[in-house]
Amino acid sequence: MFRLRQVALVAHDLDAVVGQLCETFGLSICFHDPGVAEFGLHNALMVIGDQFLEVVSPTEDGTTAGRLLEKRQGDGGYMAIYECGDLDGRMAHLAEHDVRVVWAGDFPTIRGRHLH
């Protein structure tokens, strides 16, 4: 199993972008993840079918998201989040293609990797 689970956007003004998305597409916020504070961000998640749309925005200077906003000179795509049934196998395949792991988390109910 390998599927797209979530698309994340990055924005200067979280509330404005989330408000526009909710109004335009009839969405509503389902969750704010306090865990993204670890990365200097705040966020909002919305459900679309069986997937999520997330918007993140920097809350401090020097974040990856903030640097991307500056480089692009505006809001845009930030990351795609996939779900897979065999993380170890997938990671071995990605290592063969020089994909870097920039963050790893192993928790009781979920394992995750941020890749570049």
What kind of region is each of these model predictions?
Residues 55, 61-70:
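Short, flexible helix-coil linker/hinge segments at the edges of structured domains or between repeats
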Residues 25, 85, 102-103:
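Intrinsically disordered, low-complexity linker/loop segments enriched in Gly/Pro
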Residues 58, 83-85, 106:
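Beta-hairpin (beta-strand-turn-beta-strand) motif
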